[in-house]
Amino acid sequence: MSSAAHDNHGAGHGSLGSYAIGFVLSVILTAIPFYMVMDGGFSRHATILTMVVLGLVQVVVHLICFLHMNMSSEGRWNVMAFIFTVIVILLVVGLSLWIIFSADMLMMPMP
């Protein structure tokens, strides 16, 4: 006779604390660039650099706090799948841009 018990070996869900930390960090990482843009007192270069850096930090916060990406034995396969997906997307976008710019260079000039 088969057992009715199920063994759950999947990665655990986050706690309320990890979601709260992720939310607070996300709000802070969004508010800083928003303030810099709305204030207008910062140089264009500093504003763009801050937006890019804090945007990348926010991506990492979302991956860790909300998507539960970690290097534990359960989460390692999710990380590997995510890395593979990022590589494929970068290849598709990069090679598409290469084809578009190459085609533009080969076009005859308009008279």
From Swiss-Prot:
GO terms for biological process: aerobic electron transport chain; electron transport coupled proton transport. Pfam families: COX4_pro. It is a multi-pass membrane protein. One of its GO terms (cellular component) is cytochrome o ubiquinol oxidase complex. Residues 39-46, 102-111 are periplasmic. Belongs to the cytochrome c oxidase bacterial subunit 4 family. This is Cytochrome bo(3) ubiquinol oxidase subunit 4. The lineage of its organism: Bacteria, Pseudomonadati, Pseudomonadota, Gammaproteobacteria, Pseudomonadales. The gene is cyoD.
